[in-house]
Regions:
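Signature of Gram-negative outer-membrane beta-barrel scaffolds
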Residues: 1-36
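Outer-membrane beta-barrel translocator domains and adjoining extracellular loop/strand segments
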Residues: 2-10, 54-61, 104-112, 146-148, ...
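Extracellular loop and loop/strand-boundary signature of outer-membrane beta-barrel proteins
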Residues: 8-18, 62-68, 77, 117-124, ...
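Transmembrane beta-barrel strand/turn architecture of Gram-negative outer membrane proteins
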Residues: 22-35, 74, 78, 153-161
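Exposed loop/turn and edge beta-strand positions of beta-sandwich/beta-sheet ligand-binding modules
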Residues: 23-25, 64, 76, 118, ...
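Generic recognition of flexible, low-complexity loop/linker segments
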Residues: 29, 67, 142-144
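Membrane-embedded beta-barrel scaffold of Gram-negative outer-membrane proteins
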Residues: 32-34, 38-46, 50-52, 56, ...
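Gram-negative outer-membrane beta-barrel transporters
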Residues: 91, 96-100, 118-178
Length: 178
């Protein structure tokens, strides 16, 4: 690592043979109902999991540190939506979703005993991420009744997403955006 003047700050390689064995089952269930030919209503709930990755526990920047107690994220996700095709011209998928993470991995600024301020990567807190997504696709070939040997469509995709930490043992995190 070099400073802004090009001087060598640190040239150190640390080897690790750390192993994190895991064994688990993730469960989920989904349902759908089609009250009309052009409309399907669906919902899903499932457990989610994100393991600590190599990039979570390896750093090259001396301004970053890794919390030695970093653990995997666990939680669940829910979604509810409607989708379908209207007159073979317009297809759509509109959904609401929520993801809940226990012990979400992230960075926090920390003051260390030597007075240095560093970004520490570790488990920040419990987080919820929620939003709305939509996709509307217009089949231009069907709309203009053109030969089916060709394909062309126009689509609009939107997402509205918000998130926040619901609980954390770290001061100043609860209620903040993820």
């Amino acid at each position: 690592n070099l400073d802004a003047a090009g001087n060598l700050l640190l040239n150190e390689t640390i080897f690790s043979n750390e192993t994190r064995k895991r064994s688990f089952i993730l469960l989920g269930i989904g349902t759908s109902y089609k009250p009309f030919k052009y409309l399907e209503v669906y919902n899903n709930i499932s457990q989610n999991y994100r393991s600590v990755t190599f990039s979570d526990i390896s750093i090259v920047n001396p301004a970053f540190v890794i919390n030695p107690n970093i653990t995997d994220e666990k939680g669940y996700n829910l979604d509810l939506g409607v989708r379908g095709v209207f007159n073979k011209i317009v297809s759509y998928d509109l959904s609401a979703f929520m993801l809940y993470y226990n012990d979400r991995i992230g960075f926090v600024q920390k003051v260390f005993q030597d007075g240095n301020i560093k970004s520490e990567r570790g488990n920040v807190g419990d987080a919820v991420i929620y939003g709305l997504e939509s996709l509307v696709d217009f089949n231009l070939i069907k709309l203009f009744d053109i030969d089916d040997d060709y394909g062309a469509s126009f689509f609009v995709n939107t997402s509205l997403i918000d998130s926040q930490y619901k609980a954390s043992s770290i001061n100043g995190i609860t209620g903040k955006n993820v």
